[in-house]
Amino acid sequence: MSSGGLLLLLGLLTLWEVLTPVSSKDRPDFCELPADTGPCRVGFPSFYYNPDEKKCLEFIYGGCEGNANNFITKEECESTCAA
């Protein structure tokens, strides 16, 4: 196979990985946890995965403790948890 063919194959595999959604069996367990603001009251806009709605929603994170279902961006939440 030529180097151009290998590059095309690599590009297609990369595109497939990016466009293939996370299945529920591949989803980390912490994606099932409820949003947890934690005890602090700083107030950072954050995102969490809501398994009932099957999407990432915004919530206000207090700035400490909480749980792992807490993302700075919606995109990070979706790439980690969304199906």
Swiss-Prot record:
Q: In which tissues is it expressed?
A: Expressed by the venom gland.
**Where in the cell is the protein located?**
Secreted
Give disulfide pairs as residue numbers: C31-C81, C40-C64, C56-C77
Q: Which SMART domains match?
A: KU
> What's the name of the protein?
Kunitz-type serine protease inhibitor microlepidin-2
What is an example of a Pfam family matching this protein?
Answer: Kunitz_BPTI
Q: Which family does it belong to?
A: Belongs to the venom Kunitz-type family.
Q: Which CDD domains match?
A: Kunitz_textilinin-like
MF terms in GO: serine-type endopeptidase inhibitor activity
Q: Does the keyword Secreted apply?
A: yes
Query: Which Gene Ontology cellular-component terms appear in the entry?
Result: extracellular space
Tell me the keywords, alphabetical order: Disulfide bond, Protease inhibitor, Secreted, Serine protease inhibitor, Signal
* Described function: Serine protease inhibitor.
Residues forming the BPTI/Kunitz inhibitor domain are: 31-81
Q: Where is this site: Reactive bond for trypsin?
A: R41, V42
- Taxonomic lineage per UniProt? Eukaryota, Metazoa, Chordata, Craniata, Vertebrata
List the Gene3D superfamilies hit by this protein, alphabetically.
Answer: Pancreatic trypsin inhibitor Kunitz domain (4.10.410.10)
Q: Where is the signal peptide?
A: 1-24
- Name the domain of life this protein comes from: Eukaryota
